[in-house]
Amino acid sequence: MKTFTWTLGVLFFLLVDTGHCRGGQFKIKKINQRRYPRATDGKEEAKKCAYTFLVPEQRITGPICVNTKGQDASTIKDMITRMDLENLKDVLSRQKREIDVLQLVVDVDGNIVNEVKLLRKESRNMNSRVTQLYMQLLHEIIRKRDNSLELSQLENKILNVTTEMLKMATRYRELEVKYASLTDLVNNQSVMITLLEEQCLRIFSRQDTHVSPPLVQVVPQHIPNSQQYTPGLLGGNEIQRDPGYPRDLMPPPDLATSPTKSPFKIPPVTFINEGPFKDCQQAKEAGHSVSGIYMIKPENSNGPMQLWCENSLDPGGWTVIQKRTDGSVNFFRNWENYKKGFGNIDGEYWLGLENIYMLSNQDNYKLLIELEDWSDKKVYAEYSSFRLEPESEFYRLRLGTYQGNAGDSMMWHNGKQFTTLDRDKDMYAGNCAHFHKGGWWYNACAHSNLNGVWYRGGHYRSKHQDGIFWAEYRGGSYSLRAVQMMIKPID
């Protein structure tokens, strides 16, 4: 600033002191940011002296003080100050505006850069999200296409099943019509058969003769290879006598035989005081694995009962409903006895139709029949299911499929009602219980008669086949030595 002031003072001093050059003029050539010369007249250059001063470029940053005399100095001062100040103000204003604009631009550019970065980041995220959504859309389209295919397949299956059901319904209706016609035919034939039977009975009654039931085969078609017959062993033909049995239902006294030793080798009687259990299988599961007398109470029964549980046969848990061992108990009984049961639990006994019905209908049971002949040979017949219908259906027998080595002599009785001497429900014109001397699910009449007369020695002589026989094993003229009927829940 001091240098600039000193320079201006020298300049004005030279302008005032112009004695050796009259009427001369001078021009100051200022070198600024934009340097330009002043044009001079060629004529005057020849007459006048001209001085050119090179002044270093300075920027006026404060007030300028000029001390000079005369009108020319004042004019020059005004010219310099006004022009420079105006120029400086313009420059400063312009630079300030530019600086402000640049500052705004810088700020805006910074914000824009940040926003651009954020937008780029968001763009990348959006692109990734759009890609994910696009992939999900493709998966959904594929899944819906698969679902539509599955739906079409299911619809086709439903249509096929519906068609089959309609066909089955049509066939069922046709079968119903055929069944109704066949039922009418059977009823008509039954009426005709009944009339013919009555006529035959009247004819036979006039002739004072007796109708005997049909006899089963004396020797079975299929005999076990190890079986040996002893036709010479013919014992007496007597039925067991029971002192408490009504005399009017007893057969003649010449049909009895004395008891023999039990072939099943019953151990000393064991009484189990725990319980009651619903069957012998439940007792075995409770830890009782010894054969003996147990207290059993079936579901929905009025009270408990005592019966024999057989655990010696693997795997045990068998409930014995009938047992024949030595002929000590009379099985030629009436309906009430067979309904309630009779005999000795540790020997021969019949559990009772009502008790058997309660047991067999509380669960799904199977039936095992063990047979023993007089040669100590044991065979068995097992049926996959067993149950009785209620008394209103006269304890109708329902059996499953057969397996075993004794032959199937029980299936012929499947679906038949129980018959006793005083309740005839068999398919024969007469009373099968009268001829076979015991209660059973007779057809017309029997292929098995396990409640018949116990004969010693095997083969027996009798007018009717009234022994304990299994037609497919030893035939109808061979009385077995021992029999057990047992049931157990299906595994």
Curated annotation (Swiss-Prot):
One of its GO terms (biological process) is cell surface receptor protein tyrosine kinase signaling pathway. It comes from the Eukaryota. One of its GO terms (molecular function) is signaling receptor binding. Residues 80-168 form a coiled coil. CDD domains: FReD. Its main location: secreted. Keywords: Coiled coil, Disulfide bond, Glycoprotein, Secreted, Signal. Residues 1-23 form the signal peptide. Glycans are attached at N160, N188. It is found in: Secreted. Highly expressed in adrenal gland, placenta, thyroid gland, heart, skeletal muscle and small intestine. Weakly expressed in testis, ovary, colon, pancreas, kidney and stomach. GO terms for cellular component: collagen-containing extracellular matrix; extracellular exosome; extracellular space. Transmembrane segments: none annotated. InterPro entries: FIB_ANG-like, Fibrinogen-like_C, Fibrinogen_a/b/g_C_1, Fibrinogen_a/b/g_C_dom, Fibrinogen_CS. PANTHER family: FIBRINOGEN ALPHA CHAIN (PTHR47221), FIBRINOGEN C-TERMINAL DOMAIN-CONTAINING PROTEIN (PTHR47221:SF5). This is Angiopoietin-related protein 1. It comes from Homo sapiens.
